[in-house]
Amino acid sequence: MEKSNDHDKASHGGSGGGATEKWEETSPGIRTAETMLRLAPVGLCVAALVVMLKDSETNEFGSISYSNLTAFRYLVHANGICAGYSLLSAAIAAMPRSSSTMPRVWTFFCLDQLLTYLVLAAGAVSAEVLYLAYNGDSAITWSDACSSYGGFCHRATASVIITFFVVCFYILLSLISSYKLFTRFDPPSIVDSDKTLEVAVFGS
């Protein structure tokens, strides 16, 4: 009886991962779609980075540049890292699925999550700085800056908006990499100790 149960476990284990790999290998359109989805943020990241790098203004009140604000410098670095990773991951995603090993799937999952939070944080802190620049803070007697540096604020706003579009792409990529990872594992099972039968919680 125990040998029979062990055989059932062996035949049941890994079935999810095998089905996922077979589905990926027989669907070249899926690989193409993922590659294009990973390439899409490259242009957006570069656009957000370039707009912010060129963001400076000089008038009778003085000069201001993105480099004067830590949040904007972080935004530039985050978009640069994101552009490089997007290009590299797209090249790897375009490779045949025969190399789609568990370490590779885990790597994509972890890095996609990391980049999502990295870019989201960059957009969030920059948006907060822009809010203060547009509205000021009367509680601590901060006056708004955008009334004096309108062009600077408009370019910074454009860069932040583009960054949030990048976040949307990376949320989608994170969902895809999560699906590809966790569908490789079989659902948990409940063992009936009285009948020594193994019953899948999510029975196929």
UniProtKB/Swiss-Prot annotation:
Protein's UniProt keywords contain DNA repair: no
Residues on the Cytoplasmic side? 1-32, 96-113, 177-204
Q: What InterPro entries does the record tag this protein with?
A: CASP/CASPL, CASP_dom
Q: What is its main location?
A: membrane
Q: Which positions are glycosylated?
A: 68
Which ranges does the record mark as transmembrane? 33-53, 75-95, 114-134, 156-176
Q: Where is the composition biased (Basic and acidic residues)?
A: 1-11
For the region Disordered, what residue ranges are annotated?
1-25
Protein keywords:
Cell membrane, Glycoprotein, Membrane, Transmembrane, Transmembrane helix
Superkingdom per UniProt: Eukaryota
> According to Swiss-Prot or TrEMBL, what is its membrane topology?
Multi-pass membrane protein
Where found in the cell? Cell membrane
UniProt-listed Pfam families = CASP_dom
- GO cellular component annotations, sorted alphabetically? plasma membrane
**Residue ranges, Extracellular side:** 54-74, 135-155
In the record, the note on similarity to other proteins reads:
Belongs to the Casparian strip membrane proteins (CASP) family.
Q: How does it assemble?
A: Homodimer and heterodimers.
Spell out the protein name for this chain. CASP-like protein 2A1
Q: What is the lineage of its organism?
A: Eukaryota, Viridiplantae, Streptophyta, Embryophyta, Tracheophyta
